Amino acid sequence: MQYRFCPRCAGPLATQSIESIERLVCSAPGCGFVHWDNPLPVVAALVEYQGQILLARNAQWPRRIFSLVTGFLDQKESPEHAVMREVKEELNLESTVTHFIGHYPFVEKNQIILAFAVQACGELKTNHEIAETKLISIEQLKIYDFAPLYLTSAIVRDWLTR
């Protein structure tokens, strides 16, 4: 989204180089607003369920593309709580974070992905965001083609080499 006016004073925004990065700044005298455009944190869950890895296909994605469960953090929510909440909301499963896998910049969407491994249990029931799920073994995961989801591939690779 490209803003045109200052959210503080409604003055026009202009581009200015700050610390060698082009930023939108308010051109109204005395305002001083800078749109820093910080990346949005997103959590991703590599879900271990019934001795296998659970992959999910978002309802808006093509048929063959499966990935991890992902979602945004709520205000004042820790990433660990957010990832367990997303697993509950999207899959109806209780989960426990087993470990932090890593952080991954998703430059195209201005997001930072915080990936966690979770152990899940309960009765699987998807919500409206998930079109379908599949369970695969760790051996299958090692050779699974996540293209074009390069970040999912990186997260899985890092989890496998833990």
Residue ranges and their predicted role:
Residues 2-44:
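Acidic, metal-coordinating catalytic segment for phosphate/diphosphate chemistry
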Residues 5, 25, 46, 55, ...:
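Conserved hydrophobic/aromatic beta-strand scaffold that supports enzyme active sites
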Residues 16-17, 93-102:
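A short coil-to-beta-strand element that immediately follows conserved catalytic motifs
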Residues 48-89:
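Conserved Nudix-box catalytic region and its N-terminal flanking loop in Nudix hydrolases
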